[in-house]
């Protein structure tokens, strides 16, 4: 009887310790790591492309893809989203999706090659999901990759991705200043981006020429 009591006590202690360890792991591994300077997020374990899309590998060998936090924030309001159709064979750099606001449209390239297996129908019905949760609920598509081992080497992850994003934010501020210098109408407050003004929704205030320039500078296929 004493032996059974001792065994039960040990099992109880082990169970409590396991629960504590899991709680610590959850606290130590948040779903997204914040970029301190500009309030943009990068999830741990996601690969980021230079065209501001991301790749998350699944346990089944497929790849979930979407738009990063920087792009969705600076674009601002989105009226509609169109995604490459099911079973579409995409090469890296082909158009994965288009986003539109009024008469302005941006084409966002696929970060990897493969076949479109699933499209996020909820996102198509509610484009605002891209703003609310770009890395989880706002995913764009699931792709069956074909050159994943090679193409992942061209993407950034973790600290490398964070450093690159900080440079992109700085480059975007310079881009907005250049737009002002060439005579593009600049909304009030936007010219103060170098002073730390919010970047959210900046592009929706600009005309089609600026959107086209943003496409060439920040969303070009690699």
Task: Please state what every model-predicted region is.
Residues 1-222:
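Contiguous, well-folded functional domains in the mature portion of proteins
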């Amino acid at each position: 009887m004493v032996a059974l009591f001792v065994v039960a006590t040990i099992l109880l202690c082990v169970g409590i310790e396991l629960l504590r360890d899991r709680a610590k792991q959850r606290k130590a591994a948040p779903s997204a790591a914040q970029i301190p300077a500009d309030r943009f997020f990068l999830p741990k374990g996601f690969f980021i492309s230079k065209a501001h899309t991301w790749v998350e590998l699944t346990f089944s060998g497929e790849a979930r893809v979407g738009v990063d936090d920087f792009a969705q924030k600076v674009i601002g309001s989105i009226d509609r989203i169109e995604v490459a159709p099911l079973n579409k064979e995409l090469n890296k750099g082909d158009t994965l999706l288009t986003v539109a606001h009024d008469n302005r449209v941006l084409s966002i390239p696929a970060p990897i090659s493969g076949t479109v297996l699933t499209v996020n129908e909820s996102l198509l019905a509610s484009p605002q999901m891209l703003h609310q949760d770009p890395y989880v609920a706002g995913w764009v598509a699931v792709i069956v990759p074909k050159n994943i081992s090679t193409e992942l080497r061209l993407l950034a992850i973790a600290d490398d991705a964070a450093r690159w994003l900080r440079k992109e934010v700085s480059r975007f501020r310079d881009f907005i200043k250049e737009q002002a210098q060439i005579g593009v109408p600049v909304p009030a407050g936007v010219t103060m981006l170098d002073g730390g003004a919010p970047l959210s929704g900046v592009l929706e205030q600009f005309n089609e020429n600026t959107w086209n320039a943003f496409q060439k500078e920040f969303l070009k296929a690699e």
